[in-house]
Structure formats: C-alpha cells, structure tokens
C-alpha cells in the first residue's frame, strides 16, 4: 500500500503586519486544509481560523471514510459547508467583522492511491509528478476567468491589478459552491496545497524544482516559504506538502 508523509508552514510575508492565513493537518495526516482570509486586519484572520476550526471539528466528530470515494466527496462537502456556516454566522452576528470571508482548499487522503481535493476561492492544489507541475484547481477569480476565456495570458494575469479579486469564497453567502477533484497518486508524487501568496511570487516550475531537489516535506515547506520571502512576499504564504513513497518506507 502507498505511504505518505506531510508537513506545513505559514508566514506573514514581507509586507503584511498580520497573518490572515491558517492551515490544518489532522494528527493522522488524512485531512489537510489551507485557508486565506480577507476582510480587514481582524476579519480575515478570524475567517480563516473559523474555517479550519470547523474542518478540524468535523474530523473530530466524524472522521472521513478511508476507502469509499463517494463518501469522501460527501465528507468534504459537509466540512466546507460547515466552515462556510461558521464564517457566515459570525459575520452576521458581529458588525466588526461583517463582510469577512476566506478561501479554502481541503484534501482528504484515502487508503492507498487516492486523494480528494475540494476548494473555494484561489487557494491552490498542485500535483507534482516526474518533475512536472500540474495545477489541479481552477482559481475562482476574475483574472483566471479571463485567462480561461482566452482574454489574458498567464503572464498578463500575474501583473493584472485585479488578480486578487475572487469570485467565490466562504462567508459571503449563506450557501457556497464547492469544486472537487479526485486525484489518483503514485509513489514519488507530491501534492502541494497553498494560499495565493506562494504562486504570486513563485512560478509553477519553481515550485516543482524545490520539491524535486529537497526531498523531505518539512524541508520542502521551509524552502518554498524562504524563496517566497526572498522574492518579496507581498502577501501571507502558507504551504502544505504531501509526499508519496513506496510502502516499505515512510510514516503512514
């Protein structure tokens, strides 16, 4: 059976006084989440914290199934909806944080060679395989909609003044639409979850190069954050890295 190991890091970056990102990694390394909050100095951090706490509570109350793909997809939907409810309700109850919201990307690892990804907003999931990066998620953002429509190139999107304007997030509506992606993985693959602070600075190929050279999830996370900081890090940056290894090695 395929094994895996994981690590996570977060940093406020070079230009932000407060870190509005949050992440979660369950003790059994089966549930992972990254959330990137928005809504002012207090609201953004609170929104992302509420989101990951709701996902953590879902794991505690009802851990995800380990083999049934449909049931895992349903579990992610329930967890993300619970996170949306938490942010939405807090914003309704507290005028000081009204309008706050957060992105989220969630991954649930099944037994063996399968992981399910769910996301809302522009936090991302990558599959890195054989030295090549594959973006698994489609950003819910104005600029990426323009890229998909052929109105902007990826290079133009990187410098577009509206690149941080998202079209979907947790907490802005009572109900939220969740995109999900099933991913079959194999030994030597990596899954990387991140807030948009990472790809704002590092290109996909640079992310893949770090993963290929560093080898251990904690070292990979440290190096990705370091290179982002070296590149100016205008935003908070958060990374979760999951490494898949042969069954005779590793921790899971």
PLM regions and their residue ranges:
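PP2C/PPM-type serine/threonine phosphatase catalytic domain
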Residues: 1-252
